[in-house]
């Protein structure tokens, strides 16, 4: 199965294009989500302009802030009983989280000033 993604394929400014992307293999611990909305973040713009200050493993799909609906659950996810088909979900991303910081150890990594 394939989908369309906005792919940043090199560090050169403007090296972004729509590409067909093959779905990864689906495993027992995985969830398939139908994306309903994606936002453009400052880091996406930095990559578009080639001005990012972090290491990137090209090619990379842009648009890491998104929401949607669960369409498929792996066997282990189903048995855990926390998620159901049709649940509305959002993503939360961070490039760097210090798992040893006091805030991270309390489950408040989103408040850690070292988070990037």
For every predicted segment, state its role.
Residues 1-6:
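Short structural boundary motif marking the start of a folded domain
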Residues 9-12, 38:
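Short polar catalytic/cofactor-binding loops
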Residues 45, 80-82, 112-114:
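Short, solvent-exposed secondary-structure boundary/capping segments
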Residues 12-17, 42-43:
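Short N-terminal binding/cap micro-motifs at the start of the first secondary-structure element
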Residues 43-49:
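Cytochrome P450 core scaffold surrounding the K-helix E-X-X-R motif
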Residues 95-116:
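NAD(P)H dinucleotide-binding glycine-rich loop of Rossmann-like/cofactor-binding domains
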């Amino acid at each position: 199965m394939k989908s369309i993604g906005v792919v940043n394929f090199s560090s050169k400014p403007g090296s972004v294009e729509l590409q067909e992307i093959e779905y990864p293999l689906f495993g027992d611990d995985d969830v398939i989500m139908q994306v309903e909305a994606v936002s453009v973040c400052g880091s996406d713009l930095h990559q578009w302009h080639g001005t990012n200050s972090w290491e990137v493993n090209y090619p990379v799909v842009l648009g890491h802030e998104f929401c949607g609906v669960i369409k498929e659950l792996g066997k282990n996810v189903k048995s855990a009983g926390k998620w159901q088909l049709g649940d509305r979900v959002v993503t939360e991303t961070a490039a760097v989280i210090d798992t040893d910081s006091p805030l991270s150890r309390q489950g408040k990594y989103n408040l850690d000033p070292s988070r990037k």
